[in-house]
Amino acid sequence: MTGVGTFWRTVRHLKPAQVLARLRFRLHKPRPDLRPAPARQALIGPWVQPAARDASLVGPGRLLFLNLERDLNACGWDDPQIEKLWRYNLHYFDDLNAVGSAERAGIQRVLLDRWLRDNPPASGTGWEPYPVSLRIVNWVKWLLGGAPARDAWRHSLAVQARWLSLRLEWHLLGNHLFVNAKALVFAGLYFQGTEAQQWLQTGLAIIDRQLAEQVLADGAQFERSPMYHALALEDLLDLLNIGQALAPAGSVVLTLLPNWRETAGRMLFWLRCMAHPDGGIGFFNDAAHGIAPSNAEIERYAAQLGVRALVPMQEGITPLMASGYVRVARGPAVALLDTAPIGPDYLPGHAHADTLSFELSLGIQRVVVNGGTSCYGLSAQRLLERGTAAHNTVQVAGQDSSEVWSGFRVGRRARPGKLLVDGWAVSCSHDGYRHLPGAPVHSRRWQFEDGGLLVQDVVAPSVAKTVARYHFAPGLTVRATGAGAWSVMAGDKPLAHVTVQTGQASLMPSRHAPQFGVVQSAQCLVVNLTDGRATTHWRWGTHAHSLSV
């Protein structure tokens, strides 16, 4: 059971408006408005093919979400025994715009008609605001892409938009409120008339305020998850797309397009900075492959919409000061460093206790990776994946650097100190263990050099049972080559050599979750700090060879 202290440390960061909105959301139960749908707006400009995901409708009535396939005849639309996130995905209709969608048009129409029959307005998970928002957008995209529009589908779209306009998630804010607003903009542009204009005005007003708050100066989405950042960028690109396609002359939407395009460019730069050379996102906070479109697909979509962005330096250090991340590229190495706060104080639901963690690639091979995310909800696995031990950083006295609990809650939060960049050295500290006796502070310094990286950790004052962890990517083999020395191999190819210069180290089994529903075996180097200090030296290329012979 959660203690009073943890609960207070969690709720005291909420905005008063969130608390009031939650009460209003629970108490106010509007009735669905079943009036006929407004007329449809004709296309004015070109409609660009949106970013596509992998297919999720894998056969008639067979759906694949989160790497788990089910038959709709067996599971139904809202089985409470099935994970909530899987049920949410069931109601999104992402497959309408997925890879190879046209080949499944027949079974897609059957599924859509079945949804209308089995999910009456305002009933069940499918009518919660978040799935309603994503479904409105997906249906409109599909129809704008040329799918024949049936009257029943258009009518349901209008009913959903009316319902959503009364169920906006002001109590959650963040990405939920943004996609609520995006859906209203989509409905407001797809339909004509006074009612549609009201949806449009409501959506645009929210987006105007939230875009300024949620996109930081360096382009990061403020929850600081590369996965949710990619989703937010997709949202903004979708708004650009429908604005160009449906906004009539004189519409206020046309005046917003330049700002949306500039903001999307900054967001694309941040996404590029937080990607590994293999093209995929880094695993910071809640992050997994297969939820957002691939970075390559987002790049394609952005280019077709005329979005331009800077390219990260091929050689050098790129501090993303507003969000708190650092990209380092030197020789074959690319490192992503986390010196960031865990997220907005009032919205830390997707945060992990990963402060001062990092990831490392050599060429297109990931070498050091954080633990990833395989699940949401309330489970020991969820807590494990959010905890400090699943990340490449220091854990003090068995505690988490930020007090993660439940599925999406955080009590005490680590606060990073000043980020310092000196030549090829990056250093920072945090106070996430300030509640322990002596209020210990963890400081970390990354010193990059030709063919190597020196990681120095200090915890002062020193505390017993303090360890640094380095989680190796699945598929790599790590073997001891001497006292305090290990060789890292990809198959029979040597990648790197690791020497623990200060501290007592051992190799332990580990787990990595690159996608929801996927957990892979891996290895982890665990370094026990000596007198509050650990120094770990990583070498690669010819430098690694000279150390390992």
Regions found by a protein language model. Name each.
Residues 1-73:
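Extreme N-terminal leader/anchor segments
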Residues 1-4, 10-11, 23, 78, ...:
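CBM-like, beta-strand-rich accessory domains located in the C-terminal region of large
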Residues 10, 22, 34, 313-396, ...:
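Beta-strand-rich N-terminal accessory domains
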Residues 32-52, 66-98, 173-191:
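Long, acidic, intrinsically disordered low-complexity segments
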Residues 81-84, 316, 324, 454-455:
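Beta-sandwich/jelly-roll carbohydrate-recognition scaffolds of carbohydrate-active enzymes
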Residues 84-264:
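Aromatic-lined, polymer-binding surfaces characteristic
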Residues 175-177, 228-229, 350-352, 370, ...:
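Histidine-centered active-site/metal-ligand motif
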Residues 220-369, 420, 522:
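Carbohydrate-active enzyme catalytic cores, enriched for enzymes
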